[in-house]
């Protein structure tokens, strides 16, 4: 699903998470920041890749455990196809091997969902330097 960004937006963000309630909350959090706007949301890894190709976001926030294509595989494809993208992985899973795998796949950051409020906005603001 795509969303129209405001004209004042500096960082265009795509969010991918299969938990609709979490996705909605995250969208509200990001859209409340004047320098950020959610331009699309995806419920699985394949949809995230398709939307990234269509919408050309500055940043993607992606869950690691999703249907159709997991976040690690989606991150690898996103990094390959969009090398300048700010790619932030979100997960509730604190397994070091999973975090290592998604970093190796191309994620710039891995955040636990429990760290969301403190860490995500800081990292998305850093995307400004990349765009």
Task: Report residues per predicted region.
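Conserved acidic segment of CheY-like receiver
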Residues: 9-30
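Active-site beta3 strand of CheY-like receiver
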Residues: 55-61
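Short amphipathic alpha-helix used as the core "switch/output" element in two-component signaling
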Residues: 50, 72-84
């Amino acid at each position: 699903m795509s969303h129209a960004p405001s004209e004042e937006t500096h960082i265009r963000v795509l969010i991918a998470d299969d938990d609709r309630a979490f996705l909605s909350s995250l969208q509200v959090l990001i859209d409340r920041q004047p320098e950020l706007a959610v331009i699309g949301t995806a419920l699985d890894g394949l949809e995230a890749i398709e939307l990234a190709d269509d919408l050309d976001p500055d940043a993607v926030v992606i869950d690691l455990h999703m249907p159709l294509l997991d976040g690690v595989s989606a991150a690898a494809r996103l990094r390959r196809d969009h090398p300048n993208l700010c790619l932030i992985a979100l997960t509730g899973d604190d397994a070091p091997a999973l975090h290592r795998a998604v970093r190796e796949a191309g994620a710039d950051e891995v955040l636990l969902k429990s760290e969301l409020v403190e860490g995500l906005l800081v990292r998305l603001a850093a995307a400004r330097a990349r765009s």
